[in-house]
Amino acid sequence: MSEDIVRQTINNNTKLNLKKPKQKYLQFDAYDKNYIVEIKVRNTHYDKQIIEFSKYAFNSKYAKINDQIFVYAVAIKDIIYIFNISKLENDYDFKWEWRKLPATTEFKNNDNMLKYVGYLNLADAVTTIKIKE
């Protein structure tokens, strides 16, 4: 599964019209006039999903400055879990901590590095979308 499939599935199942940013190396993977969306595609199901503080902080601030909502979309197998981070950030306990994790999720770089991360319980997703193949 790819970010493109996730973005298109979200568009097909909501009123959003998400586009892929033209700029490289942004902290988010999709946007429309009201939302910015960070997309994660995971191969393994865990009840708690990691969110990196660097992406959380940048995207939360970027969304506020641009009067948008920051959404985190996690695709696991055939389900997309949607989190409204802009809403959660007010009172959600992300349980932030330092962890040694792979530098990237791509297999090119298996080196571990220290990252400040939090956790999202899948049960706290505002909605889920089934991916149809």
Protein language model regions, located:
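Acidic-basic catalytic patches of nuclease active cores, encompassing PD-(D/E)XK
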Residues: M1-K22
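Short glycine/proline-enriched coil/turn segments at helix->beta-strand junctions
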Residues: N13-L16, D32-Y35, N66-Q68
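Catalytic cores of nucleic-acid endonucleases
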Residues: L18, V41-E89
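Non-catalytic C-terminal interaction segments of nucleic acid-processing enzymes
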Residues: K22, Y31, A75-E133
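Beta-rich catalytic cores
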Residues: L26
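Conserved catalytic cores of phosphodiester-cleaving nucleases, focusing on short active-site segments
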Residues: A30-H45
